[in-house]
A protein has these predicted regions:
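Short, surface-exposed helix/turn micro-motifs that flank interaction/cofactor sites
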Residues: 18, 36-37
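A short, exposed loop/beta-hairpin motif centered on an aromatic-Gly-Thr core
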Residues: 23-32
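Short, flexible active-site-adjacent loop segments at beta-strand->alpha-helix junctions, enriched
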Residues: 12, 23, 62-63
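Short, charged, surface-exposed hinge/linker loops at domain edges
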Residues: 1-4, 37-70
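Short aromatic-glycine-(Arg/Gly/Cys) micro-motifs in beta-strand/loop hairpins
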Residues: 7-19
Length: 70
């Protein structure tokens, strides 16, 4: 199973998510749980479409780090 890093951002009305390694792979949801489900589905569909078009599937390369600042 391949794991891609996902960035989730909260806005006043919903959550947005995007995948740094998959250009254009984005999703939204009203709750954190909903956006997680939606981005997982978006990744699956994105990869299927890339395969159908004969595109190279990128290996995950983005890394996540939490940086503390004063």
């Amino acid at each position: 199973m391949t794991e891609y890093a996902v960035v989730i951002e909260r806005s006043p009305n919903n959550y947005g998510a995007w995948v740094p390694d998959l250009d254009g792979c984005v999703s939204t949801g009203k709750t954190l749980e909903e956006v997680k489900v939606n981005i997982a589905e978006a990744i699956t569909m994105h990869l299927e479409i890339m395969r159908e078009h004969g595109e190279v599937i990128p290996e995950p390369s983005a890394q996540v780090a939490i940086i503390q600042v004063a």
